[in-house]
């Protein structure tokens, strides 16, 4: 008998609700085709929660997420709530506390250049023609963003500011294992990014990654300095499979990977804890300027569902079915407005219907 799963659905603001609707259409197709027992519950978050409950992350939303196997998150924020104090605004008051509450230490950001979308890639045509499919695995809770001491002191010419890069062994070990396990589901290659020619924290990082690599003899490990990595991503992104990064370096490289795909509407994201619980969301924002117009690209939200199935529900077949359906739609020239470039475009609803149908048909 198949296991029962429960997903907490947090549509949020802007285009969040309408692209979430498309992801749930696809989830219905997955349920039917793979006979999976998956239930969902909806909760307010972000600006919608401020409007309805007076706070961006109500206790009922947190409790609902605690009772779920995973969280499918839409997007939060918009000009309507920008006048509020920073810690009460949708982004800082909802998403960051959720990450902290559930101890989400790893961030996974796939960046893929799909066949037929090479013209959107800002790289030279001969480089884009090779395509790329990269997974950036970023450590989220350690490093220079959280290390102590940090601050400012002194005055005049002696005024200074300082931050501290700190990594503990356990932090490096667990993020490295995420990267190696992910590589086993892909092309069996990990490139670990550091600055071990200068930084003590990077020397430790490299040593521990080498140790963890012995547990994965089927995965090829290479090391690369961060400055070289930023260059190699522009020169030949097809050489990479999984990038393993510290918090700071991952912050930089994940955005670079996103940019070279040419469309934020295609990029999902996953944040995981040690138990496999995850929060899955599009990498883009709430796009309030196009909200409610039925023109937003829902693919990032649908791909976020695929990540959820793969990493939190261990349903790789279902995740792959979604990815194949998206590939088929794009190969057939089906585009939302952000990808149409003057050609005929389908609506948000139509794109969701097409992908759901392809999942059901098993393309």
Swiss-Prot record:
Task: Offer an example of a GO molecular function term for this protein.
Answer: magnesium ion binding
- Where is the protein localized? Cytoplasm
At which positions is Mg(2+) bound? 227, 251, 255
Q: Which UniProt keywords apply?
A: Amino-acid biosynthesis, Branched-chain amino acid biosynthesis, Cytoplasm, Leucine biosynthesis, Magnesium, Manganese, Metal-binding, NAD, Oxidoreductase
* Cofactor annotation: Mg(2+); Mn(2+)
Please list the residues that bind NAD(+). 78-91, 285-297
Q: Which PANTHER family match?
A: 3-ISOPROPYLMALATE DEHYDROGENASE (PTHR42979:SF1)
Similarity section: Belongs to the isocitrate and isopropylmalate dehydrogenases family. LeuB type 1 subfamily.
Would you tell me the protein name for this molecule?
3-isopropylmalate dehydrogenase
